[in-house]
Amino acid sequence: MKRREAREKALQALFQIELNEMSLDQAIKNIMEDEQDDYMEKLVEGVMANKAEIDAIIEPNLDNWRIDRLSKVDLSLLRLSVYEIKYLDDVPNRVSLNESIEIAKIYSDEKSSKFINGVLANIAPEDK
C-alpha cells in the first residue's frame, strides 16, 4: 500500500474513532478488512497515543476557532498531519503538508483544504 493510501485509510479510521467512539483495533479492522499496513497502523496508533499533546499543538494555531468546533474530518486530518510532522522524522514536513491538503480536497472541501494548509503552515517548520 502506498503512503497516500495508508494516510487516507488512517484518516478513515481516526474519523470512525472520533465519530463513533470506536476502539482503535475495531476501527483499523473495519477500514482494513483483511489487509494489513504497518504505516497506516503506526499513524492511527501514534495519533491516539499522543492525542492530547497533538490537540495542544493544534489549538493555539486555530485562528478564532476552537478544536471542538472543527468538523470531525478536518480534526482527524489535522491530528494525522501533526503526528507526522512532530513525531515522524522520516517524513519531510512539506510532504505531510501537501498530502494533507490533497486528502482534504477529497474528503472535505476547498475551504477546508485552505484552512488545513493555514493551520499546518503555522505548525510545520519548512526545513524538516
Swiss-Prot record:
The keyword Nucleotide-binding does not apply. GO terms for biological process: DNA-templated transcription termination; transcription antitermination. One of its GO terms (molecular function) is RNA binding. Keywords: RNA-binding, Transcription, Transcription antitermination, Transcription regulation. Pfam families: NusB (PF01029). GO terms for cellular component: cytosol. It comes from the Bacteria. Belongs to the NusB family. Involved in transcription antitermination. Required for transcription of ribosomal RNA (rRNA) genes. Binds specifically to the boxA antiterminator sequence of the ribosomal RNA (rrn) operons. This is Transcription antitermination protein NusB. It comes from Listeria monocytogenes serotype 4a (strain HCC23). The lineage of its organism: Bacteria, Bacillati, Bacillota, Bacilli, Bacillales.
